[in-house]
Amino acid sequence: EISCSLVGSEMCIRDRPIIAVVDPDMMSSMPKGLTASTGMDALTHAIEGYTTKAAWEMTDMFHLKAIELISKSLRGAVANTKEGREGMALGQYIAGMGFSNVGLGIAHSMAHTLGAVYDTPHGVACAMMLPIVMEYNQECTGEKYREIARAMGVAGVDEMSQEEYRKAAIDAVKKLSADVGIPSVLEAVKEEDLQFLADSAHADACAPGNPKDASVEDLKDLFRKIMA
């Protein structure tokens, strides 16, 4: 991706590979912070892909398995364990197989904008926005948050009410992000920036796939939640 701060967006450059080599041993030298942020980006791929407007049965299978693998493996990958690296290599790959067919949502739209305007690492921005966007989207996701909570290892989801399992899924994402050391606020964001940020995110290519249509004013309110 190439960032352009003037328009507040990150533009994707695509060069389709003939073959991709996914080798966890090649990831063993990644710093902890990079492992954490890219892992949360992969989780955002999986959760947004699972809940996007275009989601369907086949991609749901990919995304739920990716959520399960990433949730089980990211802490270990950050600690550089062999099992953690292997699980993340497979989880991020499966998430890519899913979302590349159905697109993403406004967590990515907003993360693209934060990256372009403030040079925020993409995975960090995704991790900040994901639980906020999940809370915003929850009324338009049916029972999918129950399956997200289950895939993330939450116990007793079958006995939970809709309100309870939706909160459990969001809380599980927050805990994983905190456990791998990602902050929940971005001090660079100022009130006077919100209009530009929201306009840019609203125009992002990922925004139309969000399960709940977000207005510019909605996006301003969501950006406000990561302000210090």
Regions found by a protein language model. Give the residues of each.
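Core active-site phosphate/anionic-ligand binding loop and the adjoining beta-turn-alpha structural block
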Residues: 10, 16-78
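Oxyanion-binding "anion nests"
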Residues: 66-110
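Gly/Pro-rich interdomain helix-loop hinge
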Residues: 117-196
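Short, amphipathic C-terminal "tail helix"
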Residues: 192-228
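Single conserved hydrophobic/aromatic residue that forms the stacking wall/gate
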Residues: 1-8, 12-13
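Short alpha-helical scaffolding segments that buttress acidic/His motifs in well-ordered protein cores
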Residues: 43-47, 88-96, 110, 130, ...
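Glycine-rich phosphate/pyrophosphate-binding beta-alpha loops
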Residues: 93-126, 204-209
